[in-house]
From Swiss-Prot:
This is Serpin-Z2A. Residues 370-394 are annotated as: RCL. Belongs to the serpin family. One of its GO terms (cellular component) is extracellular space. GO terms for molecular function: serine-type endopeptidase inhibitor activity. It comes from the Eukaryota. It comes from Oryza sativa subsp. japonica.
Length: 424
């Protein structure tokens, strides 16, 4: 795996490969696309934490990690740095939450519970999937809605949680940030946006005369739009500004002064129909884990005409097929899945665990002030040959029948009102 210390290289490579897969579908159907690599990565990493054998190997390959320890370190770094909330100091609001719901008749293995709570900061809760699947689904959706500030009201659709559901693993991310240099609303004008098929549509374009971070490359140009973060004076350096956050200072030391905090990067192909080729180039790059970092603008430039459209994009899909196309097949195969690291006594209960469905939902809105976005990923896991121990206590009146199985002939029938009475 190609990765640099301190960077989320595995996640970046995963993001670009997944972007290609989802973009192929989006372009063919002429639909916009938004998804959260961070949310999907966290949810799939939760699956990997309980996977073994080929199931684990395929997940690690997809997520760009050499081992579970390597994966946990990558997730830890992402949570502590990439998803750090700086709203208290005037920066972007970022929240990330993970949850593990398991059927109340299943006990999580101590090692899995520890990993979920420790590395992934996940809440673990028992649910009554067998007897109250609809109620359990509503509770999980309510948790997601709260975690995403109501931008994702539902991640689990009707029927996705049922009597055979054993576990549901969920991630939810919320982001809201203001631009470091907001676009004046008075400068927003209507203009033509040219679609891939050659047609055009009138859209509101945000505009600015401020110097911007712009980088020029072979076949495409990159615009960096930083989000506002609180700054403080560096008294040892004559008044230069640095971030007032220990986490972003760590990034400052690693990357250098300009690449600090959170930013949106817009990759604009030179050709109007060049987006598919650009996405292919990103995904196929031999250094895909560092592609975004290597093409970040490093200095501000004077601009003449800067126009960026306002937009709001959403996405909701079950993505089993996409993940299988990227090499993760064993986890979905009842005959091959090995998720034996998740729950106690699974083998003794008549079958193993298998991933049933993976749902992903995301929404982003970009306007003159900044960006608001949210995403959620849910993995439903069922127990094969589900067989729960059921109580049968005949401590009240009952009927009985003696039946010949093949013919169905009833040899005897009756009922018992009082076992102590012979009732002759």
């Amino acid at each position: 795996m190609e990765d640099n210390a301190g960077d989320c290289g595995g996640m970046t490579a995963f993001a670009l490969r997944l972007a290609k897969r989802l973009a192929d579908v989006g372009v063919s159907s002429n639909k916009n696309l938004v998804f959260s690599p961070a949310s999907l990565y966290a949810a799939l990493a939760l699956v990997a934490a309980g996977a073994r054998g080929t199931t684990l190997d395929e997940l690690l390959a997809l997520l760009g990690a050499a081992s579970l320890d390597d994966l946990e370190e990558s997730v830890r770094r992402a949570v502590e740095v990439g998803l750090a909330d700086e709203s208290a100091s005037g920066g972007p609001r970022v929240s990330d939450a993970c949850g593990v719901w398991h059927d109340e008749t299943l006990e999580l293995k101590p090692a899995y519970r520890a990993a979920a709570a420790g590395t992934y900061k996940a809440v673990t809760r028992a649910a009554n999937f067998q007897r109250q699947p609809k109620r359990s689904r509503k509770k999980i959706n309510k948790w997601v809605s709260k975690a995403t500030n109501k931008l994702i009201p539902e991640i689990l659709p009707d029927g996705s949680v049922h009597v055979d559901t054993a576990l549901v693993l969920v991630n939810a991310i919320y982001f809201k940030g203001k631009w470091s240099n907001p676009f004046p609303r008075s400068s927003t004008t209507t203009g033509k946006f040219h679609r891939l098929d050659g047609s055009s549509v009138d859209v509101p374009f945000m505009s600015s005369r401020e110097d911007q971070y712009i980088g020029f490359h072979d076949g495409f140009t990159v615009l960096k739009l930083p989000y506002h973060h609180r700054t403080m004076k560096n008294h040892g350096d004559g008044g230069d500004t640095i971030t007032n956050s220990s986490i972003t200072r760590a990034i400052l030391e690693h990357y250098g002064g300009e690449n600090v905090g959170l930013s949106m990067y817009i990759f604009l192909p030179d050709e109007r129909d060049g987006l598919p080729a650009l996405v292919d180039k990103m995904a196929a790059s031999s250094s895909s884990s560092s592609f975004l970092r290597d093409h970040r603008p490093t200095r501000r430039r004077e601009v003449g005409d800067l126009r960026v459209p306002r937009f709001k994009v959403s996405f909701y899909s079950q993505i089993n097929g996409v993940l299988q196309g990227m090499g993760v097949t064993a986890a979905f195969d009842a005959g091959e899945a090995d998720l034996s690291g998740m729950a106690e006594g699974v083998d003794q209960r008549g079958g193993g665990l298998v991933v049933e469905e993976v749902f992903h939902r995301a929404v982003v809105e970009v306007n003159e002030e900044g960006t608001e976005a949210a995403a959620s990923t849910a993995c439903t896991i069922r127990l094969l040959s589900m067989s729960y121990p059921e109580d049968f206590v005949a401590d009240h009146p009952f009927a009985f029948f003696v039946v010949e199985e093949t013919s169905g002939a009833v040899l005897f029938a009756g009922h018992v009102l009082d076992p102590t009475s012979s009732s002759e």
